[in-house]
Structure formats: structure tokens, C-alpha cells
Amino acid sequence: MHSIKRSLAVMGTIVALMALAPVASAGSHRAFHLDKTCAEDGSEPLGYICTVQHSDFKWIPAGTDIRYLSEDGNVVQASIEIRNGSTDGACTWSSDVDAICVFSAGTGRLTQFNLEVVVTANADQSVWYWDGTYWFGD
């Protein structure tokens, strides 16, 4: 009888820990940084495309394109497509060189991906910087 109660207690503990594991990992915010350059491209909706030159997030490596799809006032819709996934977001510009971009959800490897970054540029706007945090989950 005691061994059955002990087994049930152990199983209950395991189930409780398994239920809490996704919650713990979902809330884990991590630092994010990338550098990108942008070039004119008449085939793109807004006439330019940006390419990641360096990233400390392995799923958005150097060479990844960031596309800007539409704009409404100071808000520009953006899309990042990687091998086996994508995510969409919005960048709100406060000046020609300052913005905040927010991405959420996604597909494939970027399912439940969330990203919030501050966008800045170097003096001649040849390199753009994204600095902020990312996490997976709701």
C-alpha cells in the first residue's frame, strides 16, 4: 500500500514538473543583436531589401534577408524568412534612423518566436543595428 502511494506521489511530481517546464522556458528573455545593410531593389514592395551581416541569434544568420512589405504612416510591416520558418512584425519609426520593431508568432523554427528591438544606424546609414530581446512562447 505504501509503495502504491509513493509511486502515485512520484508520478504526480513528475507530471507537475512537466507542466511547469514550458512555462519556465517561455519566459526566458535573451539578448538579441544583429547588423544589417540595405540596398535598393525595385522588385521589393518598398523598393529596398536588407541583408543580415552579423547576428548572435543562430536562426537568423548572416545572409538572411529582411523584407519590408508595406507602410502606413510611420509603421512599416517587415518579414524575415529563414530556412524552415518565418516571422512577421512591425517597425514604428520615430525618426529617419530610430525605430522599435516587434515580431511575434512565426512558423517552423520561429514558431512562438517573439522579438523586440531598437533600431539605430551608423552615421552614414550604411549599417543598421537591431538590439533588444527575444523569447519563445506567448
Question: In which residue ranges do the predicted regions lie?
Answer:
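Bacterial N-terminal signal peptides
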Residues: M11-A19
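Short, intrinsically disordered low-complexity segments
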Residues: I4-K5, A16, H29
